[in-house]
Amino acid sequence: MRGLLLAGALALPASVFAHPAHQSYGLNRRTVDLNAFRLKSLAKYVNATETVIEAPSSFAPFKPQSYVEVATQHVKMIAPDATFRVVDDHYVGDNGVAHVHFRQTANGLDIDNADFNVNVGKDGKVFSYGNSFYTGQIPSSAALTKRDFSDPVTALKGTTNTLQLPITVDSASSESTEEKESYVFKGVSGTVSDPKAKLVYFVKDDGTLALAWRVETDIDSNWLLTYIDAKSGEEIHGVVDYVAEADYQVYAWGINDPTEGERTVIKDPWDSVASEFTWISDGSTNYTTSRGNNGIAQSNPSGGSSYLNNYRPSSSSLSFKYPYSVSSSPPSSYIDASIIQLFYTANIYHDLLYTLGFTEKAGNFEYNTNGQGGLGNDYVILNAQDGSGTNNANFATPPDGQPGRMRMYVWTESTPYRDGSFEAGIVIHEYTHGLSNRLTGGPANSNCLNALESGGMGEGWSDFMATAIRLKPGDKRSTDYTMGEWASNRAGGIRQYPYSTSLSTNPLTYTSVNSLNAVHAIGTVWASMLYEVLWNLIDKHGKNDAPKPTLRDGVPTDGKYLAMKLVMDGMALQPCNPNFVQARDAILDADTALTGGENQCEIWTAFAKRGLGAGAKYSSRNRVGSTEVPSGVC
């Protein structure tokens, strides 16, 4: 927002800020531009066509754990001199592809931005992989032995001073944890939880390896991992931000905002497979309010970090019906309806994503995973009418096992003001940040959409999912859609162009990214490409307008849900911090894994139309476009 790195924020064009929004917390109070500290994209992706590695015959078909051995042997073959560890978040997706993630180590410490992901097919062979391992010289362990580096408190103070964090560290002290060179800080004020520090290595922009402290500070509007040089205690090498800006009377699923329909009363809307405890239980406690296994929704007028004791409506009869009118004012007068709408939209999206493969083992957001894999205790904290800002929204995605946090704001660009919780596309956009961050790089690593281009694609995936869900029964490929039109009170929405298959209406192509340096603008290009994929698949397979897909052998039978499924499967295949070309290849690979490549022509044609054809080349400053479709594909 305003040029600051607020990953997951919805964002607006500059013109929307003619009347600046009030900001009360976090980085919005400062002038430090965190974009300067974004991590660089280091990974390469070897797609399924390029991967011709045979797994040992004894592993085909693989047993429940043998895919880890296949992946490990592959890493040893590609990087024979590297030391590494297996990240404990591997799983087999519902398309039959296993995902295993590795972290490179040096002298017993993690190289925090050196990752390797291996995707193993159902036949027990390596399907594709991504690699950002460091290949340069590993430094001597002498610095560690002699402890020739700054102490963690110095690192915390250096981080706070350089980034101008609104926290007080004068009385900070550090306590060691059970992990090697890992500390938690006490005596710090202004943070949601005690800051942490861990000694790691970090691959710098110039390709060299630096010893660094990874300092974690959650200050509500920003949840930061700061890599500060362990010797100087001042130079910052990179920053990751986890924040990416019964009977229910609601706008039903598929109604994007109040201009598209009326509120209705919906009874027991949960999916009993995706939400086996319903939406208002966590398996041990049954609630009579907007709290359950998938989310907890409440009012947050102060904009603070506390939520458990915040106000939420309660009904002993489980009748969550509260008045709302678009002409009502102030927004606090309809807070009950706002909380229930937010709770409904987030929960029903959870259930849809579960059906499409975002399950417990894939790192979804649930308090109780009920023995289905993954880590629990991480429902989504859903703050309605959050007082920490206006005219926006954001989502914080920490690693699996820690709650996601969505902040929905009031929009002040109309009279009366409008509440973002009543525009489903905004809620879906924010929740999708949690989806894309958990799937890319694995559930245990939330650092994999932090480069400029990958962060842009994060915004694009969020817009795409919101738009796909918004489609109406009578829509055709000539139908255009905007983002945030109702909440912002802007006829053209909050993006540069509407999403359209017309190059006249929306002329964005791959090379448009060369002139862009903001994630939301880059995301509009990516989502425009995915909108082309969506309609090519709908033209081939038809469109299911029901709130859930029909699956045949795990494959959606229609084009809309198939496109959403392939996009999600591609997230799990692609490397950490991918670029457009790699993400395109991952979607093509997802189709190969799911359908045997039945839709390669439609996918290639869609990407080629907007310049991401077979000859497209990535460069951070001079991307080369291509409208070429590979021969023999169509």
Curated annotation (Swiss-Prot):
Pfam families (alphabetical): FTP, Peptidase_M36
Maturation propeptide residues: 19-245
Top-level lineage group: Eukaryota
Record PTM: Not glycosylated according to PubMed:8188335, but glycosylated according to PubMed:24100314.
Gene Ontology biological process terms, A to Z: proteolysis
Keywords: Allergen, Calcium, Disulfide bond, Glycoprotein, Hydrolase, Metal-binding, Metalloprotease, Protease, Secreted, Signal, Virulence, Zinc, Zymogen
pH dependence comment: Optimum pH is 7.5-8.0.
Function statement: Secreted metalloproteinase that allows assimilation of proteinaceous substrates and probably acts as a virulence factor. Catalyzes the hydrolysis of elastin. Hydrolyzes azocasein, synthetic fluorigenic substrate Abz-Ala-Ala-Phe-Phe-pNA, and His-Leu, Ala-Leu, Tyr-Leu, Gly-Phe, and Phe-Phe peptide bonds in the B chain of insulin.
Protein name, entry field: Extracellular metalloproteinase mep
